[in-house]
Design a protein with these regions (language model features):
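Hinge/lid segment of periplasmic solute-binding proteins
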Residues: 39-48, 113-165, 216
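Short helix-initiation/N-cap motifs at beta->coil->alpha
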Residues: 87-95, 113, 185-190, 270-289
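C-terminal capping/gating helix-and-loop segments adjacent to ligand/active sites or protein-protein/ligand interfaces
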Residues: 366-377, 389-444
Length: 444
């Protein structure tokens, strides 16, 4: 006999069901966007993600992290989506732990193309969406996009960047002494000789950096190799298509030695050639301010190392000029930066990655200060800091041939190991041959 449910119980069940449904639908405010508002017109392509949350994990912390959160606030307000950001000083280690443990963030900002490739090869990363590809291609040069492209597929989009091809100097000292900013390598060496003849050491440097001691010297090699041999040889070198002790690399290293291992040139205000190895990166350029050294080759981010109250400007206490090319018709530039990559392909994750590749985010972040981007549509009027503005001008120059920091492209055992150690030993007395042979032998 078929069982029957009393009609009154059925009715009661229906009422309860309706009540539960109403509670589920009406118990909270339905998430909505504000894309219909005039101030949100730039975000109309990011619809359908209201109420969604996207997690981002990176190495950017403290004040810089706060500025990042401010930079995408308008995106959140207009789209109704939320970005949950976490910055850590242990990023390189912890991103591997999280990914391997199945706790990958939706998006990570990765500064090492080699690490991006590792995650691509492991199948962990998602390819960039069509929207991200279109946006990134419109806003960044192929020189940048290639560092996040593997087997013809784009996985990451550039975010922030820095320029390493700078020489810091004192505008006041140069003016008082009648020294002109050199525009070619030959002029740079001629100026160095002129300064040395006055009894002042023209150059100062420091490569001590704890467990990372040596990295500033690797930047010297990379920057000069781009000038000495050109971008094609540079590309062959970082991928080990030519050995580390190839004659072309020997040539560039010897050229660096004409400055860094020249007792008449270094180490102004600090000591002899060997003192470079024991002088911290942070202190390596400080004698420029006191006039005991004339020039210091270091990246745009060295602006943060000058003593409090130092005016960084073309008419200030310190400023920087472009590290001259050997061939004045060329403009090689060494730099680095972060790429946004995704470990999930939900629509909201794809939307955030596309937004971060846009001119809207680049300009939003630039207005907040202390930011450089290679985004071609970054408006220079939004970049207030003089050295940041000069960096953006260089990155946007159509003559610029950009190459990413070589040590970040090499296997970590080389780029963050034997290369650092080898260059430190080179500064303290080892020959170029011994040094390059040692580094080459470590490349497995």
């Amino acid at each position: 006999m078929a069982s029957r449910t009393p009609r009154r119980l059925l009715a009661l069940t229906g009422v309860i069901g309706l009540a539960l449904t109403a509670a589920a639908c009406g118990g909270g405010t339905t998430a909505k966007d504000n894309l219909d508002k005039p101030e949100c017109v730039a975000f109309k392509d990011y619809s359908g993600i209201a109420g969604k949350t996207v997690s981002i994990y990176a190495s950017i912390r403290d004040t810089e992290a706060d500025l990042l959160r401010q930079s995408w606030k308008e995106f959140e307000n207009c789209t109704g989506a939320k970005i949950s950001y976490e910055g850590t000083g242990e990023f390189e280690t912890q991103i591997n732990v999280r990914v391997d443990g199945g706790r990958a963030p939706d998006i990570a900002f990765i500064p090492q193309p080699g690490l991006i490739e590792k995650f691509v090869n492991s199948g962990k990363l998602k390819a960039a969406s069509d929207k991200t590809k279109t946006t990134a291609t419109a806003n960044y040069s192929p020189d940048w996009l290639k560092y996040a492209t593997f087997n013809g597929t784009l996985y990451g989009a550039p975010l922030g960047s820095n320029v390493k091809s700078f020489v810091w100097y004192s505008p006041k000292t140069f003016k008082d002494k009648g020294w002109k900013i050199p525009e070619t390598w030959d002029e740079l060496i001629a100026l160095s000789n002129t300064i040395a003849a006055t009894g002042t050491k023209p150059w100062c440097a420091g490569i001590e950096s704890g467990v990372a001691t040596g990295w500033p010297a690797t930047d010297w090699i990379e920057d000069v190799l781009l000038r000495d041999q050109g971008p094609d040889v540079y590309d062959q070198w970082v991928t080990h298509k030519i050995p580390f002790n190839d004659p072309k690399i020997v040539s560039a290293t010897e050229r660096v030695g004409t400055i860094l291992k020249n007792a008449n040139y270094v180490n102004g205000g600090i000591g002899d050639v060997k003192s470079i190895a024991t002088t911290s990166f942070q202190e390596g350029g400080l004698p420029v301010v006191s006039g005991k050294c004339a020039m210091h080759r270091q990246a745009s981010f060295y602006a943060n190392q000058w003593p409090q109250g130092t005016k960084v400007a073309e008419d200030g206490d310190v400023f920087a000029f472009y590290f001259p090319a050997i061939d004045p018709s060329k403009k090689p530039v060494l730099g680095a930066g972060e790429f946004t990559v995704t470990f999930a392909d939900r629509p909201e994750v794809q939307a955030v990655q596309a937004y971060l590749a846009s001119e809207h985010h680049a300009n939003s972040r630039a207005k907040l200060g202390n930011w450089v981007s290679a985004n071609k549509k970054l408006d220079l009027t939004n970049v207030a800091n003089p050295i940041d503005k000069k960096s953006v001008e260089i990155l946007q120059d159509t003559k610029t041939v950009f190459r990413f920091d070589g040590s970040d492209l090499m296997p970590s055992g080389v780029g963050a190991g034997s290369f650092w150690k080898g260059m430190t030993d080179w500064i303290t007395g080892k020959s170029t041959k011994e040094t390059l042979d040692f580094i080459e032998s470590s490349w497995k």
